[in-house]
C-alpha cells in the first residue's frame, strides 16, 4: 500500500446540536473545531440529528394518517379522477 494517501482515522467527538448529546467514535472527518472531553482534546463534528434526538429512536414517532390524506385527495380530485363530469 502507498504511504500518505489514506485519510487520518482517529477518535472524533460528534455533538448533537438539538440536545447537546456528545459521543466519541472513530472517523476520518475533517473538522475545524476541537473540544476537550475527559481530559483529552478531540476534533469536534457538529451534527443536527443523532440517535438521541431522532424520532425513530426516541419513540416519539408521528404516525401519518394516510387514510385521511386519501380522503382529502378524493374530495379534491374525485370527480375528475372517476371520469364523471359535473
UniProtKB/Swiss-Prot annotation:
One Pfam family from the record: Ribosomal_L31
Keywords, sorted A to Z: Ribonucleoprotein, Ribosomal protein
One GO term describing the cellular component: ribonucleoprotein complex
Keyword Hydrolase among record annotations: no
Family matches, as Gene3D superfamilies: Ribosomal protein L31
Top-level taxon in the UniProt lineage: Bacteria
Keyword Ribosomal protein included in the entry's annotation: yes
GO biological process terms on file: translation
One GO molecular-function entry: structural constituent of ribosome
Similarity remark: Belongs to the bacterial ribosomal protein bL31 family. Type B subfamily.
Quaternary organization: Part of the 50S ribosomal subunit.
Protein name: Large ribosomal subunit protein bL31B
